[in-house]
């Protein structure tokens, strides 16, 4: 894990050949949906493991079949809330939660409009109560403009959680700057920080639309009435 000196509390995993190999497969335009999903799960599991190293542990004593010995207890891991942004973040969350099995999970449905305003619409939010003892982890594969994440983080600002983290696959510097301007204390963990955003708000070189690549392209809304009329 590498601390990026351009910002406080921003880390990447560019020093991990294993994750860089996984990312290479995700970038490949020929990678199929199932392989893409598995790659996101893999990244989530690895990054979740690394996150546990940043949490507090308490010393404890445990009785083995032979004698007592010292061990550790994860103090923070029992107070984790994972927030998943539909739909691309589901596989990433699946990997994360393997390291935080007692975590509470919240779901947010948010969509970003087109350039130039990139308007954010939050259509659905169902999250557990957050307390000052909790660590909130927001999983979103792509930190592009940062607008969606800012909207989500605002939902928890008044709860004053102990820590707020973002876990993603790729980030653009523009997105990190936007998030940090609103939430300077949020911690950001991504596999890699890419070069920039293009005019359409996509990360470059990026990996395309993570949701479509993980689950397939969705039906157009105009097709839904036709589906309802099918007998």
UniProtKB/Swiss-Prot annotation:
DNA repair as UniProt keyword: no
GO terms of biological process kind: UMP salvage; uracil salvage
Regulation: Allosterically activated by GTP.
Cofactor binding mode and count: Binds 1 Mg(2+) ion per subunit. The magnesium is bound as Mg-PRPP.
Disruption phenotype: Loss of sensitivity to 6-azauracil.
Cofactor: Mg(2+)
UniProt keyword annotations, A-Z: Allosteric enzyme, Glycosyltransferase, GTP-binding, Magnesium, Nucleotide-binding, Transferase
EC number(s) stated in the UniProt entry for this protein: 2.4.2.9
Coiled coil: none
Binding residues for 5-phospho-alpha-D-ribose 1-diphosphate: 87, 112, 140-148, 209
Taxonomy, superkingdom: Archaea
Pathway: Pyrimidine metabolism; UMP biosynthesis via salvage pathway; UMP from uracil: step 1/1
UniProt: GTP binding residues: 38-42
Annotated catalysed reactions: UMP + diphosphate = 5-phospho-alpha-D-ribose 1-diphosphate + uracil
A GO MF term: magnesium ion binding
Binding site for uracil: 203, 208-210
SUPFAM superfamilies with a match to the protein in the record: PRTase-like
HAMAP family tied to this protein: Upp_A (MF_01218_A)
Family: Belongs to the UPRTase family.
Matches recorded under NCBIfam families: PRK00129.1, upp
Protein name: Uracil phosphoribosyltransferase
